[in-house]
Amino acid sequence: IEVTDSLGMVLQLVSKEESKWELYGTETKVILEKVCPFDIHLFEGYALIVTSTYFGSYMKDVSQRLIRTKVDPNAENTIIMKDYFYKGYDLKVKFTTNDLLNPLIEMEDQPFASTMEAFDTIYGDWEVWAYQSGYYLSYYSSCERFIFQYMTLHVPGMPAGKDEVGTYINVVKWVSDDEAQILIEEGVNNSLK
């Protein structure tokens, strides 16, 4: 079974006619999905921000970004994405592991960039902060080693109603050292410079 394959089947209840209930019928459909065990170390090392809607809005010369990630030694099931979009601004993401069929990621409100770097001017308290969008689910795949993240940005210190920048979609995929080296040689925007 490949990483994203599932197996579906229809089961037929075999019983005496008098024990059948019309309300429920005698068939049920079952779908088995492949689930890989969670290992936090699958999400450390080189990672490629494959795409981000933020790039199109504020980093027009960037289509992908190579970063490094490491396991947070102080928080369970959490990684630190070093220099995520801007140098000196790391982002922490926590992986939920209580339901492997619903593998979600969580992110607390945290600094994302300086307003000068992001917008070429000073706004509010001079920093852009990022938090997990409350409207959409962000998730991960241990089998495919990626996260799909909805991230909402805001600027503290701005007047109420004018502090939110927007919600952006990021897709981050972990790559091998060899793949990272090829990306570096190809000139992919990277935080490792």
Spell out what each predicted region is:
Residues 1, 5-193:
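Ser/Thr/Gly/Pro-rich, low-complexity flexible regions
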